[in-house]
């Protein structure tokens, strides 16, 4: 994945309030350096540190995660907004697939986007043991 694509995606995710616009400037190098960066979830005031990790098969991924109260409706709204934003950013050439259901008491929803060899995942996960629900953004980065 080209570094400018990641920066462009982050810009698209951040358009909105002034604080989100400020956040965009901080994330222009997301995926192009090993530095952890802070990203604000679109439509919310929730910020998190995004981190880069290595993938066993090669390359790396940038992960961002936002915690909500367990099964909070706001988490579902934020997840749907993030899915919509990523879809709009990637355009009609992107394909989106939903992950299969899991046999587990916690809720899980993953939407994976593929476009021109790029992969972006947006997920919503209930963690009963932690009494929290998470929205995750994962961007595959080829090194």
Residue ranges of model-derived segments:
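Sec-dependent N-terminal signal peptides
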Residues: 4-14
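N-terminal leader/targeting segments
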Residues: 8, 17-63, 76-79
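Short, solvent-exposed secondary-structure boundary motifs
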Residues: 35-47, 101-105, 109-117
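Long, charged/polar, surface-exposed segments that mediate recognition or autoinhibition
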Residues: 47-108
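Short, exposed beta-strand-loop hairpins at the edges of beta-sheets
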Residues: 112-115, 119-132
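Short, low-complexity, Pro/Ser/Thr/Gly-rich segments in the mature regions of secreted, periplasmic
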Residues: 129-143
């Amino acid at each position: 994945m080209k570094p400018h694509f990641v920066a462009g995606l982050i810009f698209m995710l951040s358009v909105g309030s002034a604080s989100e616009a400020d956040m965009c400037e901080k994330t222009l190098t997301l995926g192009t350096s090993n530095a952890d960066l802070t990203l604000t979830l679109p439509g919310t005031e929730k910020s998190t540190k995004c981190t880069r990790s290595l993938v066993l098969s090669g390359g790396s991924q940038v992960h961002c995660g936002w915690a909500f109260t367990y099964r909070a409706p706001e988490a579902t709204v934020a997840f749907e907004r993030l899915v919509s934003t990523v879809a709009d950013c990637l355009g009609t050439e992107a394909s989106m697939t939903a992950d299969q259901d899991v046999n587990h008491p916690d809720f899980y929803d993953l939407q994976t986007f593929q476009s021109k060899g790029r992969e972006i995942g947006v997920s919503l996960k209930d963690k009963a043991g932690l009494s929290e629900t998470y929205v995750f953004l994962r961007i595959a980065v080829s090194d």
